[in-house]
Structure formats: structure tokens, C-alpha cells
Amino acid sequence: WLKEYKIDGYRMDLSHGLCGTTNNAMTHIADYYNNGVKAVSEDAYFILEHWGSNMGSDRPKLISQGMMCWDNVTEAYQETAMGWLGSKADFSRANRDGYVTYCESHDEERMQYKAKMYGNADLKTNEEARLNRVAVNVAFNVLLNGPHMLWQFEEIGYDFSINSSDEKPDEYNTDNRCSKKPSPYTLGYFESEIRMKQYTQIAQIIQLRTKLLPEVFEGNPTVANING
């Protein structure tokens, strides 16, 4: 797969469930798989969705062995998408080497749906105001230290619930979790000027980190809180 299809790497779902009677056995198995992948392509990503009661001790060890670990900080980004800046809007966990953080994922609610339902002030009713926060919210994540992920259609402000369905797009029903969703192509999202503006701005933000000023994001950056 790495050579024939040129994939970038692998993500292991629920890696804390790997066979083994001890945590050491699980981490040894993960290390074995990681070494096998790196033997084929030393630049390949090897990402673990590693939760469980021992993740606090497991994950630093796995990261020290060259792997990356999934870390869910979606609640903080949902808060800022909705315009609520309380204690829940804390990005500190998204600012760490070795932890893949994200605003949205296949398991979590869409930020723009949350903003549409629970947004502060006019964000709940003003679509343009909501969508103008899409690129800003992504910048809050991808410009921090460490690896980050962008989930599909996040960049155009997809705003139907993870619990919606194509047949009843406005109905919230947990039975629809894995149902087919309204298509952004059918909805005309890629013809929307304001949505494509967010798409372009997010691409520029990512290029700032990866192509224009990569040296700024390498090493150990200085972090400071600036008030006033």
C-alpha cells in the first residue's frame, strides 16, 4: 500500500485494544507495527487512536517511539465556533508535539451545526457571520504546535448534524449516526462564494505553515499569553 498506492501512512483504530495482557504488550505490538511501516517508508505516518484508562502513561511512551496519538479537543473548537469564550474554549491540549488534534472528526458533531443551533448572539441566525468564523477556527488549531487534522468538508462549513440523514436532513436522530448525509455538492456548497472563501483562506493558512514559513513552526516555539 505504501509503495503501490503511495499512501501517507496508517491510523490504527482503538489501538488500546490490541491483544496483550499488559500495557507493555500493547505498546510493544504497536511499536512492532510502526517499525514495519517505517521499514518500508521512513516518512510514513503511524497514528494511534489510543484511549483507555492507561492512556496517560501509554501515549507519551508511544510518542517517544516515533508514533503519533489521536487527541480529541473538539469541545474547545465547538465553543469558539459558537462564539462562547468560557473555560471550555481551552486550546492548550492542541499545542503539543506528537498529539494529532482536530476541530472535527468522523465521531464528533460538526462545528457549524453547533453554531447554527446554539450560537451566541446573531451567530445562531446569521449564516454569513457563522461561516466567516470557519477559517479563523481552523487557524486556531493548525497554527499551534504539533500535528493536526482537517476533517472532510470542515473547510466549507458543512452544517448538517452527524445525526442527520439525507432523507430528513433537519431531523436530529441518533439512529442516523451512520446514515448517508446531505451532499455538499448537491447543496451547492462549492458554488457558494462565502464557503469557497473559507476554503481558500484555510488553504493559505496551511501553506503558511508548510511552505511559506515552515521554520516558524519547527523546534520549540515560545508560547506567551498577551493581555490588553
Model-derived regions: residue spans:
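Active-site-proximal helices and loops of the catalytic beta/alpha 8
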Residues: 14-103, 108, 130, 139-143, ...
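Short acidic, glycine/proline-rich loop/turn micro-motifs
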Residues: 114-116
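Active-site groove signature of glycoside hydrolases
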Residues: 1-21
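Hydrophobic "anchor" residues on beta-strands that sit immediately upstream
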Residues: 9, 45, 151
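Aromatic-anchored helix/helix-loop segment that forms the rim or "lid"
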Residues: 88, 119-138
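Short, solvent-exposed loop/turn elements at domain surfaces
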Residues: 110-112
